[in-house]
UniProtKB/Swiss-Prot annotation:
It is a multi-pass membrane protein. The keyword Cytoplasm does not apply. One of its GO terms (cellular component) is membrane. The gene is AMT14. Signal peptide: none annotated. Part of the gene clusters that mediate the biosynthesis of AM-toxins, host-selective toxins (HSTs) causing Alternaria blotch on apple, a worldwide distributed disease. AM-toxins are cyclic depsipeptides containing the 3 residues 2-hydroxy-isovaleric acid (2-HIV), dehydroalanine, L-alanine which are common for all 3 AM-toxins I to III. The fourth precursor is L-alpha-amino-methoxyphenyl-valeric acid (L-Amv) for AM-toxin I, L-alpha-amino-phenyl-valeric acid (L-Apv) for AM-toxin II, and L-alpha-amino-hydroxyphenyl-valeric acid (L-Ahv) for AM-toxin III. This is AM-toxin biosynthesis protein 14.
Length: 293
């Protein structure tokens, strides 16, 4: 087929079809800067919540300082730095998947908020613990690192790896096929763990009764933790659309249906012509004029 033939296949005008993780034109006139900045707000809010809870604990107990259990504060600070870096990368390179990964890392900070060691939890000591993720999901017991917390840490590592692969996929001159073949299962497993733990946490909240249930519905709890978690879960509901954006998917579906209808119409027309021709052949031929007697 010559190069001047208009039927010759050409590369798509939108290069993001080959690199769907790079957002060059946002659908629905979305403000990507505001979307990518949300994880920074969540992460900063969780870090301030951690410091606030430590302050409340130190003010209630004289034998506990503000910097008690510095390990959890350090983990929150590390997650905040990673979230900040990923958000900046998402803003500069305009990669939506990196923004989702930073949102997931911000949600990860809820797992280490006031996560006590293997000690029995006393509601009278600190009522703020009633909505913490580790207290709600896992009873303090034999191990100081329950399987749920390990799953959350693994989720954070997977999201960091996915963000790195997204940046690699966005770099020019690289083959995206190998990158995407590793990126797709990593994102699937990471978000699968994320939503599994999130649903277990919601079920645990729904099973609370008495004073614990009344404490959950306080506005302070919703402002500090529950509302940002719900928002991050809603934001995280879009990772599957990164490979096939809704607009492109809808257009491909419409084109496929149009081709299917056209093929069905052509097949029906061919069948009708065949039936007409067979009917004409089956009828006896008669002379248009009567035979002369």
């Amino acid at each position: 087929m010559p190069a001047s033939d208009p039927r010759r296949l050409r590369s798509p005008l939108n290069p993001s079809i080959h690199s769907p993780f790079v957002i060059r034109q946002l659908p629905f006139e979305m403000d990507f800067s505001a979307t990518a900045s949300l994880p920074i707000g969540f992460s900063s809010l969780f870090l301030l919540t951690e410091v606030y809870i430590r302050h409340v604990e130190s003010s209630r107990r004289r034998d506990i300082s503000l910097l008690s259990n510095c390990w959890y504060i350090a983990v929150n600070t590390g997650l905040w730095i990673c979230c900040l870096v990923l958000s900046i990368v998402a803003l500069v390179l305009r990669i939506e998947a990196v923004s989702l990964s930073s949102c997931q890392l911000a949600w990860m900070q809820a797992a280490v908020l006031k996560a006590s060691d293997a000690q029995l939890w006393q509601p009278s000591a600190d009522q703020l613990q009633v909505y913490h993720l580790r207290i709600l999901l896992f009873l303090p017991g034999e191990s100081s690192w329950p399987y749920g917390v390990l799953a959350l840490v693994l989720t954070a590592c997977l999201q960091c790896a996915a963000a790195g692969l997204c940046v690699w996929d966005a770099a020019p001159g690289l083959t995206p096929h190998l990158t995407r073949s590793a990126l797709v299962p990593i994102l699937h497993v990471g978000w699968g763990l994320h939503y599994t733990v999130f649903l277990l946490w919601i079920l645990r909240i729904c099973s609370l009764k008495g004073n614990d249930l009344r404490h959950i519905w306080k506005w302070r709890v919703w402002c500090l933790l529950v509302a940002p978690l719900f928002i991050s879960a809603l934001v995280g509901a879009t990772p599957l659309t990164l490979w096939y954006p809704p607009k492109i998917t809808f257009l491909f579906w419409c084109r496929k249906q149009q081709m299917r209808w056209r093929m069905l119409g052509e097949r029906g027309a061919v069948q009708s012509l065949r039936s007409v021709s067979s009917t004409v052949r089956a009828q006896p031929t008669s002379h248009p004029y009567p035979a002369a007697l």
